[in-house]
Amino acid sequence: MCQNRIMFKQFIMAGAIDIVQIDACRLGGLNEVLAVLVMAAKYNLPVWPHAGGVGLCEYVQHLSMIDYLVVSGTKEGRVIEYVDHLHEHFVDPCVVRGGHYLPPARPGFSIEMKPATLASFAHRPEKASAA
């Protein structure tokens, strides 16, 4: 699994991959993702973001939109993973209709968590030491 732009560059230049599956958790942030998107566009390879964890569907919808609007200009051959769980913990969860992500209604990366969720999963040292 490619974890940075250098690994993607080596695999792409060697012709070793047909699909660029970026992993938002493994790549070092948006700038690293942008570098990979540009390389994929140069070699005419489709990008399929991986979105398997909590909040990743909310995040990768933006990466695909950036790819379409800024880098590749195409939706042809593009796929985004979708995992239908845990969206209820987000203020502005992703919405999929007819097999397509809808653009978010609010600014940001759609990963703001609800205060009740944060409170329910907060670390409580007093409870940990009692066990």
Question: What kind of feature is each model-predicted range?
Answer:
Residues 108-131:
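Extended hydrophobic packing segments that form well-structured cores
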